[in-house]
């Protein structure tokens, strides 16, 4: 497809890299020549220097023949206006990044009235992901499918866990409840496991299971868990505001430390149930005074990756807390594997996942096997996709054991009218099902792509 991206920032560049990898024709628009030069040195794209809200600039970028226009500049207003002009100029699909909390309340009205195909709020989406991690403190990552009926949860197998040295095939019979191990990361290697694979101490495993069974499973297999009652957040930006709102509704005690006095005053008015502390979150004495040692969860959400890493390492040292760190520039896998700071979230990757899901659904619009959900796991080396199943000869009605599936691919879960099935070889896919596929084959666009 022909895709135009307005904005060469972190999100735009990350998205452009993936779209080019999936063989789309990408053109960038930005007013900053140095950013355009940088992106041209990284990926094979066309670039236009100019204002994306000006019709002549859009025309030069090829808007009349574009399939999709994505606006991810730093300005919500520019994103919305450029999408409106792009829609009028070519009737293409339009995607806008909209971050202002004032717009967030009316986003469905804005989307409908402006004819937007999709809106994405990275700060809100990241706050929701962090809230999931706080809900399941034993997890390193939580992704949801089937309208939140099914979850893929990543755990670290600790020393002393009964899972260590157990075959994957034996796990289901050894413990009560329903869960399936679908991905293993071991010493930088990704394994889509067969039943013969033996689990090891230190493995990162991604497990499909219902949320209600997580605590019971963790206790049975020796993974430490706890009930989080209070949360300390470093940084008082928009993401912290969204997160505090979510946590307040869940009756968590929240404390935000913010350096800017005016921002503190604003947050105090917006978040009456949250304690707002004016001060420098990198000041260890202040953290001690605010009793960081007693906090159940510490979330580093300042605007600087380096500060967030420092804060998380300090929290790990002085508090027995669930540790969550926001990273946007530094390579995520280096942080999570080398520094072991806890759970790492990246707004640019969350945004990219969301938009890629829409792009692949567009490509597959002529087929009914559409992508409902897409997550990229393990430093983007694994994809977990949820497909809606339509009647497909050679695929539907055939026992799974008789399908010629690609290697390094696993059908993890079937949702049949709200009934969640952990599939065996004797199960079949039926029209109307949704199915979760986990694979190292990146870029699947339709369900039939799972076949050799």
What are the functions of these language-model segments?
Residues 1-452:
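Cytosolic regulatory regions of ion transport systems
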């Amino acid at each position: 497809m022909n895709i135009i991206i307005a904005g060469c920032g972190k999100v735009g560049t990350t998205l452009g890299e993936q779209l080019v990898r999936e063989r789309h024709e990408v053109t960038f628009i930005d007013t900053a020549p140095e950013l355009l030069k940088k992106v041209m040195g990284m990926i094979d794209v066309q670039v236009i220097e100019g204002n994306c809200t000006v019709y002549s600039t859009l025309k030069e970028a090829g808007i009349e023949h574009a399939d999709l226009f994505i606006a991810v500049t730093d300005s919500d207003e520019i994103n919305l206006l450029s999408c409106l002009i792009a829609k009028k100029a070519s009737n293409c699909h339009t995607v806008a990044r909209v971050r202002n909390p004032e717009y967030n309340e009316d986003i469905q009205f804005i989307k409908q009235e402006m004819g937007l195909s999709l809106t994405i709020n990275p700060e809100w989406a990241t706050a929701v992901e962090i809230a999931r991690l706080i809900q399941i403190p034993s997890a390193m990552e939580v992704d949801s499918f089937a309208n939140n009926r099914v979850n893929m949860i990543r755990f670290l197998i600790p020393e002393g866990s009964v899972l260590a040295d157990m075959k994957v095939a034996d796990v289901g019979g050894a413990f009560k409840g329903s869960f399936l191990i679908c991905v293993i990361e071991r010493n930088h290697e990704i394994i889509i496991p067969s039943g013969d694979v033996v689990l090891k101490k230190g493995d990162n495993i991604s497990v499909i299971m219902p949320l209600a069974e997580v605590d019971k499973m963790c206790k049975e297999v020796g993974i430490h868990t706890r009930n989080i009652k209070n949360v300390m957040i470093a940084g008082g930006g928009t993401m912290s505001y969204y997160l505090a709102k979510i946590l307040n509704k869940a009756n968590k005690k929240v404390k935000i430390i913010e350096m800017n006095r005016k921002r503190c005053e604003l947050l105090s008015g917006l978040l009456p149930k949250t304690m707002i502390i004016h001060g420098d979150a990198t000041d260890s004495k202040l953290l001690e005074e605010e009793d960081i040692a007693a906090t159940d969860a510490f979330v580093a959400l300042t605007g600087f990756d380096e500060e967030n890493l420092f804060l998380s390492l300090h929290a790990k040292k002085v508090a027995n807390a669930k540790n969550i760190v926001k990273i946007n520039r530094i390579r995520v896998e280096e942080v999570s594997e080398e520094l072991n700071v806890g759970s790492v979230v990246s707004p640019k990757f969350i945004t990219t996942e969301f938009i890629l899901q829409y792009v692949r659904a567009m490509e597959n619009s002529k087929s009914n096997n559409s992508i409902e959900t897409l997550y990229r796991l393990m430093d983007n080396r694994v994809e977990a996709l949820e497909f809606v199943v339509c009647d497909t000869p050679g695929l539907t009605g055939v026992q799974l054991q008789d399908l010629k599936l690609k290697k390094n691919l696993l059908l993890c879960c079937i949702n049949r009218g709200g009934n969640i099935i952990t599939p065996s070889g004797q199960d079949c896919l039926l029209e109307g099902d949704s199915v979760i596929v986990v694979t190292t084959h990146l870029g699947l666009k339709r369900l039939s792509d799972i076949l050799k």
